[in-house]
Regions:
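Structured mid-to-C-terminal alpha-helical surface segments
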Residues: 1-201
Length: 201
Protein backbone atom coordinates (compact mmCIF):
# COMPACT_ATOMS: atom_id res chain seq x y z
CA UNK A 1 0.00 0.00 0.00
CA UNK A 2 1.94 3.01 -1.32
CA UNK A 3 1.04 6.55 -0.28
CA UNK A 4 1.57 7.96 -3.79
CA UNK A 5 -0.81 5.42 -5.33
CA UNK A 6 -3.44 6.03 -2.64
CA UNK A 7 -3.29 9.81 -3.22
CA UNK A 8 -3.45 9.34 -6.99
CA UNK A 9 -6.54 7.13 -6.68
CA UNK A 10 -8.32 9.60 -4.39
CA UNK A 11 -7.39 12.51 -6.69
CA UNK A 12 -8.92 10.61 -9.61
CA UNK A 13 -12.14 10.16 -7.62
CA UNK A 14 -12.11 13.83 -6.55
CA UNK A 15 -11.70 14.98 -10.16
CA UNK A 16 -14.77 13.05 -11.31
CA UNK A 17 -17.43 15.57 -12.36
CA UNK A 18 -20.83 14.62 -10.94
CA UNK A 19 -22.49 17.77 -12.33
CA UNK A 20 -23.62 18.81 -8.86
CA UNK A 21 -21.46 21.89 -8.36
CA UNK A 22 -19.38 20.20 -5.65
CA UNK A 23 -15.61 20.02 -6.05
CA UNK A 24 -13.02 18.13 -4.03
CA UNK A 25 -9.28 18.64 -3.73
CA UNK A 26 -6.67 16.57 -1.90
CA UNK A 27 -4.73 18.76 0.56
CA UNK A 28 -2.17 16.30 1.90
CA UNK A 29 -1.54 12.77 3.14
CA UNK A 30 0.22 11.75 6.35
CA UNK A 31 1.30 8.45 7.89
CA UNK A 32 -0.86 7.04 10.69
CA UNK A 33 -0.89 3.89 12.85
CA UNK A 34 2.83 3.35 12.43
CA UNK A 35 2.72 0.81 15.27
CA UNK A 36 0.65 -1.51 13.06
CA UNK A 37 2.21 -4.09 10.76
CA UNK A 38 1.07 -2.34 7.60
CA UNK A 39 0.47 1.18 8.92
CA UNK A 40 -1.85 3.50 7.06
CA UNK A 41 -2.47 6.99 5.75
CA UNK A 42 -4.75 9.90 6.53
CA UNK A 43 -5.76 11.95 3.50
CA UNK A 44 -7.14 15.46 4.02
CA UNK A 45 -9.66 16.60 1.43
CA UNK A 46 -11.30 19.99 0.89
CA UNK A 47 -14.86 20.00 -0.42
CA UNK A 48 -16.40 23.16 -1.89
CA UNK A 49 -19.91 24.13 -2.94
CA UNK A 50 -20.17 27.79 -3.97
CA UNK A 51 -19.09 29.70 -0.82
CA UNK A 52 -19.24 26.64 1.43
CA UNK A 53 -15.91 25.02 2.27
CA UNK A 54 -15.60 21.87 4.35
CA UNK A 55 -12.45 19.94 5.15
CA UNK A 56 -12.58 16.24 6.06
CA UNK A 57 -10.20 13.32 6.42
CA UNK A 58 -10.14 9.79 5.02
CA UNK A 59 -8.24 7.18 7.05
CA UNK A 60 -6.91 4.31 4.97
CA UNK A 61 -5.40 1.16 6.44
CA UNK A 62 -5.19 -2.54 5.68
CA UNK A 63 -4.66 -5.77 7.55
CA UNK A 64 -7.09 -5.17 10.42
CA UNK A 65 -9.07 -8.25 11.46
CA UNK A 66 -12.82 -7.92 10.88
CA UNK A 67 -14.83 -10.28 13.09
CA UNK A 68 -16.84 -12.22 12.11
CA UNK A 69 -16.53 -10.66 8.62
CA UNK A 70 -17.40 -7.52 6.70
CA UNK A 71 -21.09 -6.68 6.35
CA UNK A 72 -23.13 -5.60 3.34
CA UNK A 73 -24.76 -2.22 3.90
CA UNK A 74 -27.06 -0.14 1.70
CA UNK A 75 -26.37 3.58 2.02
CA UNK A 76 -29.06 5.97 0.79
CA UNK A 77 -27.71 9.24 -0.62
CA UNK A 78 -29.33 12.20 1.16
CA UNK A 79 -29.32 14.36 -1.99
CA UNK A 80 -30.35 11.99 -4.79
CA UNK A 81 -31.92 9.11 -2.89
CA UNK A 82 -29.65 6.71 -4.76
CA UNK A 83 -28.90 3.49 -2.86
CA UNK A 84 -25.22 2.56 -2.79
CA UNK A 85 -24.07 -0.95 -1.76
CA UNK A 86 -21.10 -0.83 0.60
CA UNK A 87 -18.87 -3.27 2.46
CA UNK A 88 -18.60 -2.15 6.09
CA UNK A 89 -17.03 -3.27 9.36
CA UNK A 90 -19.10 -5.32 11.77
CA UNK A 91 -20.31 -3.41 14.84
CA UNK A 92 -18.19 -5.70 17.01
CA UNK A 93 -15.00 -4.78 15.14
CA UNK A 94 -15.80 -1.05 15.21
CA UNK A 95 -16.30 -1.18 18.98
CA UNK A 96 -13.17 -3.29 19.50
CA UNK A 97 -10.92 -0.96 17.53
CA UNK A 98 -12.22 2.12 19.31
CA UNK A 99 -11.88 0.50 22.74
CA UNK A 100 -8.30 -0.53 22.01
CA UNK A 101 -7.50 2.97 20.77
CA UNK A 102 -9.01 4.64 23.85
CA UNK A 103 -7.13 2.32 26.20
CA UNK A 104 -3.77 2.35 24.44
CA UNK A 105 -3.64 6.11 23.92
CA UNK A 106 -5.03 6.88 27.37
CA UNK A 107 -5.08 10.60 28.25
CA UNK A 108 -3.00 11.36 25.14
CA UNK A 109 -5.95 10.52 22.88
CA UNK A 110 -7.03 13.83 21.38
CA UNK A 111 -9.97 12.34 19.45
CA UNK A 112 -13.05 13.01 21.56
CA UNK A 113 -15.09 11.37 18.80
CA UNK A 114 -13.69 7.96 19.87
CA UNK A 115 -15.31 8.43 23.28
CA UNK A 116 -18.56 9.66 21.76
CA UNK A 117 -18.75 6.77 19.31
CA UNK A 118 -18.40 4.19 22.09
CA UNK A 119 -21.07 6.03 24.09
CA UNK A 120 -23.61 6.34 21.27
CA UNK A 121 -23.06 2.76 20.11
CA UNK A 122 -23.80 1.61 23.66
CA UNK A 123 -26.92 3.77 23.84
CA UNK A 124 -28.35 2.89 20.42
CA UNK A 125 -26.87 -0.39 19.16
CA UNK A 126 -26.43 -2.64 22.19
CA UNK A 127 -29.23 -4.98 21.07
CA UNK A 128 -27.45 -5.46 17.73
CA UNK A 129 -24.11 -6.44 19.28
CA UNK A 130 -23.27 -10.09 19.89
CA UNK A 131 -21.14 -10.12 23.05
CA UNK A 132 -19.44 -13.41 22.21
CA UNK A 133 -18.42 -12.00 18.83
CA UNK A 134 -17.35 -8.76 20.50
CA UNK A 135 -15.01 -10.67 22.81
CA UNK A 136 -13.41 -12.44 19.85
CA UNK A 137 -13.15 -9.20 17.86
CA UNK A 138 -11.46 -7.43 20.79
CA UNK A 139 -9.07 -10.34 21.26
CA UNK A 140 -8.07 -10.34 17.59
CA UNK A 141 -7.75 -6.55 17.46
CA UNK A 142 -5.46 -6.53 20.51
CA UNK A 143 -3.39 -9.41 19.13
CA UNK A 144 -2.98 -7.63 15.80
CA UNK A 145 -1.91 -4.43 17.55
CA UNK A 146 0.35 -6.22 20.05
CA UNK A 147 -1.67 -4.91 22.99
CA UNK A 148 -2.94 -6.51 26.17
CA UNK A 149 -4.52 -5.19 29.35
CA UNK A 150 -6.17 -6.72 32.41
CA UNK A 151 -9.73 -5.72 33.31
CA UNK A 152 -8.75 -3.94 36.53
CA UNK A 153 -6.06 -1.98 34.67
CA UNK A 154 -8.55 -0.99 31.98
CA UNK A 155 -11.03 0.28 34.57
CA UNK A 156 -8.26 2.14 36.41
CA UNK A 157 -7.15 3.71 33.15
CA UNK A 158 -10.68 4.88 32.40
CA UNK A 159 -10.87 6.42 35.88
CA UNK A 160 -7.69 8.32 35.09
CA UNK A 161 -9.12 9.48 31.75
CA UNK A 162 -12.37 10.58 33.40
CA UNK A 163 -10.52 12.71 35.96
CA UNK A 164 -7.95 14.22 33.59
CA UNK A 165 -8.61 17.93 33.17
CA UNK A 166 -7.12 18.15 29.67
CA UNK A 167 -9.31 15.31 28.45
CA UNK A 168 -12.37 16.96 30.00
CA UNK A 169 -11.48 20.29 28.42
CA UNK A 170 -11.18 18.64 25.00
CA UNK A 171 -14.56 16.99 25.57
CA UNK A 172 -16.19 20.32 26.43
CA UNK A 173 -14.76 21.87 23.28
CA UNK A 174 -16.00 18.91 21.23
CA UNK A 175 -19.56 19.06 22.58
CA UNK A 176 -19.76 22.79 21.82
CA UNK A 177 -18.50 22.27 18.29
CA UNK A 178 -20.52 19.15 17.41
CA UNK A 179 -24.27 19.55 17.70
CA UNK A 180 -25.16 15.87 18.20
CA UNK A 181 -22.88 15.63 21.25
CA UNK A 182 -24.29 18.74 22.91
CA UNK A 183 -25.45 18.03 26.45
CA UNK A 184 -23.69 14.67 26.77
CA UNK A 185 -21.67 14.69 29.99
CA UNK A 186 -18.29 12.98 30.05
CA UNK A 187 -19.09 10.93 33.15
CA UNK A 188 -21.93 9.18 31.29
CA UNK A 189 -19.60 8.53 28.36
CA UNK A 190 -16.93 6.89 30.53
CA UNK A 191 -19.60 4.92 32.38
CA UNK A 192 -20.77 3.39 29.09
CA UNK A 193 -17.20 2.60 28.04
CA UNK A 194 -16.71 0.77 31.35
CA UNK A 195 -19.82 -1.27 30.55
CA UNK A 196 -18.18 -2.39 27.31
CA UNK A 197 -15.12 -3.42 29.33
CA UNK A 198 -17.30 -5.40 31.75
CA UNK A 199 -18.82 -7.21 28.77
CA UNK A 200 -15.38 -8.24 27.54
CA UNK A 201 -14.01 -9.84 30.72
Amino acid sequence: MEKEQIVKTIETICNTDANDGITFKVIDATDIRQEDKYGGFQVRVLGKLENIRHEFVIDIATGDPVVPSERNYKYTCLVTGEVLPLKVYSLESVISEKLQTVLSRSVANSRSKDYYDLYILRETQLDNVDIKTLKEAFKQTCNYRNYSIAKEDAISLLDEIENNQQVKNRWETYTKKVKYADGVDFESVVSDIKKWINDLY
